[in-house]
Amino acid sequence: MKILVDADGCPVKDIILKIAKKYHIKVVMVKNICHELHDDYAEIITVDQGRDVADITLINHTEKGDIVITQDYGVAAMALAKNAHAIHQNGWAYTDENIDELLMKRHMGQEIRRKHKKYTKIPKRTKEDDLQFERFLIHYLDENILKIRGHQDEI
């Protein structure tokens, strides 16, 4: 089991690393060449810039039982299809029950933006957002780590 991070624009990389070290979980961060990222604990995979290159690379490194941390609903859907776990950087899990609705909302939002050329402003991330993610990831690992690590025996 490992944690894979869609690292381009991910605001919780430091939190992920802190928790992964505590739980002795390998971390793989995938980023494109436009972002600088260095860490002695995590494996950093750097890919060319291009549409979905980092996303496809991340999914190609994902295995059953892994945890993928991403804000991209499409990446989350592909992770779930590989029987991996998917977590949003705001501290909630993507599931088979919510992914279809999330993808539909994303599609509808894209259509509206394309039609009206109107874009919403994303609110600035707060310290509380980071705390919520940290609490969620710890709780998620505490609740699921035995199940997740149990999948390793099946591989």
Curated annotation (Swiss-Prot):
InterPro entries: UPF0178. It comes from the Bacteria. It holds the Pfam family DUF188. Belongs to the UPF0178 family. This is UPF0178 protein Clos_2709. It comes from Alkaliphilus oremlandii (strain OhILAs).
